[in-house]
């Protein structure tokens, strides 16, 4: 089945890509969730126009992403305050939205929680951590933050 992606799909492609997928994957997952549309000649022409406009925007976005990266890497004193037990273990874990709020509170830019890549092992103890923030397809920044007891 030939589809045009309307959103970025991990391990498949980015919005605007024309992809060939198995019928069941397209019919049962991509189409119902609005992640893709069926590829027709009219849709392909429309996507070409959208891609041209997107390329112009991407150049501006790339410059903005570089500025945000510089801000994030110069940022210090990012701390997430959470409730902990007497032994220093957290009640729950630190989520991407907690990190985004801490960056904003420390004077950094607004971050989308989906762009923050937390470590595979969840943050469940106090201490210093690093996370990657994907700002653009080509640019990622590293943010250092500390989890402290509230």
Curated annotation (Swiss-Prot):
InterPro entries: Ribosomal_bL9 (IPR000244), Ribosomal_bL9/RNase_H1_N (IPR009027), Ribosomal_bL9_bac/chp (IPR020594), Ribosomal_bL9_C (IPR020069), Ribosomal_bL9_C_sf (IPR036791), Ribosomal_bL9_N (IPR020070), Ribosomal_bL9_N_sf (IPR036935). Keywords: Ribonucleoprotein, Ribosomal protein, RNA-binding, rRNA-binding. One of its GO terms (cellular component) is ribonucleoprotein complex. It comes from the Bacteria. It holds the Pfam family Ribosomal_L9_N. One of its GO terms (molecular function) is structural constituent of ribosome. GO terms for biological process: translation. Belongs to the bacterial ribosomal protein bL9 family. Binds to the 23S rRNA. This is Large ribosomal subunit protein bL9. It comes from Corynebacterium diphtheriae (strain ATCC 700971 / NCTC 13129 / Biotype gravis). The lineage of its organism: Bacteria, Bacillati, Actinomycetota, Actinomycetes, Mycobacteriales. The gene is rplI.
């Amino acid at each position: 089945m030939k589809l045009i992606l309307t959103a970025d799909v991990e391990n498949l492609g980015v919005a605007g890509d024309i992809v060939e997928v198995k019928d069941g994957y397209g019919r049962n997952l991509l189409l119902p969730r609005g992640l893709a549309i069926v590829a027709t000649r009219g849709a392909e022409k429309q996507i070409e126009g959208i891609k041209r406009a997107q390329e112009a925007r991407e150049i501006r976005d790339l410059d903005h992403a570089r500025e945000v990266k510089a801000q994030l890497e110069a940022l210090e004193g990012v701390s997430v305050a959470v409730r902990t037990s007497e032994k220093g273990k957290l009640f729950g874990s630190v989520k991407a939205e907690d990190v985004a709020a801490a960056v904003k509170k420390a004077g950094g830019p607004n971050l989308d929680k989906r762009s923050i890549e937390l470590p595979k092992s969840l943050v469940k103890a106090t201490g210093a951590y690093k996370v990657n923030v994907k700002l653009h397809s080509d640019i990622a920044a590293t943010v250092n933050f500390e989890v402290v007891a509230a």
